[in-house]
């Protein structure tokens, strides 16, 4: 499988998992919408700060 996991980064804290097995990421106005392989969606006011493609990681920071 080639899905990535999305992590939320906060200062001084280890990155925490936000959503596993992410299949799609897209903008919806000021939000990011992440959808997993089962069609579950999570919406967050955040920006992508890093895509680690080999490690299958999407790193987010809240706006």
Locations of regions flagged by a protein language model:
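Compact, glycine-rich, soluble single-domain proteins
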Residues: 2, 6-63
């Amino acid at each position: 499988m080639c899905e990535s996991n999305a992590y939320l980064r906060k200062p001084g804290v280890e990155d925490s998992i936000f959503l596993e097995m992410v299949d799609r990421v897209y903008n919806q106005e000021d939000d990011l919408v992440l959808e997993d392989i089962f069609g579950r969606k999570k919406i967050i006011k955040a920006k992508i700060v890093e895509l680690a493609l080999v490690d299958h990681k999407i790193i987010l920071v809240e706006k």
